[in-house]
Amino acid sequence: MNNLLDDIKNNYLFYGFYQRYRAKGRLRSIKRNKKKIPPYLLKDNFEQELNYKLWSTKGARFEASTRNLIQKKLSAQSVGFLSAYLIVINIVHIYNLSFWKLNITANDVAFASTAFSILILLYSQLESAEDHGVKAEKFHSCALEIGELYNKLRLSKSQETDEEKRKRIREISNEYDLVLRKYDNHKSYDREKFILNKYHYHGLNFFERFFGQAKYYFLVKFKYHLLIWAPLILFVGLNILKIYEVIK
């Protein structure tokens, strides 16, 4: 009987400790989530909300324009590198040269040349369809238009009465909706890049910034760098393996 009472007592103490631990965990979670709430939502103020929307959307559209310019540049570079690799392969075939330690047959060279030709053709078509140059220009124009609305809203804070300000806010909000309908939306990682650039305002720590930048790199730049450097890395890697086999 005493053992049963002791077990009940211990279980009760353990359960009480567990409940207190969960309560503290919920409290910490609430505090963390409260810190992540955007400042403009902490107060029920439509003017502040519109101000943040204009500011953040303008920044995201500028980031989208910059991203498309970067992709346009990297796309041209990757096509150039792939074309250079194709020329080198054909030169090796014509002059009967060797690939360092690799013994490449004529059939291997012909296959590699054909594969690179198909890859360049397909990749060029896909990148041409993206039309990064035109998108960059449109996103830039959109950001400028939203920037004008943002400046109007900022000026209305100090130069108008409350009634005039409310009327101006409604007008700016309607104009903002019209601007959004005119242009394509930016990608989610464009807004994330804007938030990363304004990390002090959004309260991001080092790890959030690091993983955010890494995610942006893999989504925007990685595929181009892979096309540029993968053939060269593959060539060097195969030669290193060949040298290792010779030494062994």
List the model feature ranges, each with a label.
Residues 69-134, 211-248:
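Alpha-helical transmembrane segments and their immediate juxtamembrane boundary regions
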